[in-house]
Structure formats: structure tokens, C-alpha cells
Amino acid sequence: MMVKAGCGTDAVIKEITPLLQPGDVLVDGGNAYFGDTRRREEEIRPTGIHYVGTGISGGEVGALEGPSIMPGGSKESYEIIGPVLEKISAHVDGEPCCAWMGTDGAGHFVKMVHNGIEYADMQFIGEAPSLLLAAGFNKAEEP
């Protein structure tokens, strides 16, 4: 399931869980807040359905060539879906860019940390020229 984070995710879950059976796995690949993922895991657990909050990263290239996949959920759920996720993920040196992150919203937590680092890097890159000019460096000068 790839749904915009928030109430839309809850609405889709409410709509599709009656169609699922105990032992089925529901993968949430949206950018959900990990606290919401924890709540959803707790709410769905009594049904016997495995809810897996999963961070997915890679943008357009990832969509075409395979993303980095960060699934959370129970270890049992990863044993069920891990082989499929590993096959569709990106690979580096023959190894899948996919690993179980842990329980309790861990997949979405790791994705949140990833996004924080990525956005900080982009902010730094965007501000670096201004900072260098303010420090007296001239882009026309040779190093």
C-alpha cells in the first residue's frame, strides 16, 4: 500500500482489512510517522494480519531500478515477505538494499532519520555558496 501519510492511510486500512485473512501481510510503504505505525500495528495485531511499516527510498531511479527498502513489523512478517522485498530492491555488489529494521514502527522510524539526513544535506548544499561568499571567498578566485 502506497498512500499519503495520515488519515488516508487509516481509511484504506479500514477498507481493506475486512478483505484480508489471518496470516496475510499488509505492507505500508507510505511516509508514515512511526508513532502512527506503532498504533496501526497494535490495532491490526489482534486480527492476525501482519502490518509492516516500510520505508522506501530511491525516487525515480529507485522506481525504475529498485529502491532501498526498510521494512519493520514482526520478524515473522519479514520471514514471509523478505524474499520478495529483497528481489525487488536495489542491489549493491550483489547484496539487496533491504533488511528488517525491527519491530514497533522501526521501518518508518529509519525512513524518518534517512529523510532528516538527506534534507539536511540538501540544505547545506543549497546554503554553502552563500556561506562561502559571506566568509570572503570569491568564486572567481583560484584555489
Regions found by a protein language model. Name each.
Residues V3:
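Conserved NAD(P)H cofactor-binding loop of Rossmann-fold oxidoreductase domains
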Residues G8-K14, V27, Y33-N138:
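Rossmann-fold dinucleotide-binding core
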Residues E142-P143:
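Small-residue-rich helix-loop
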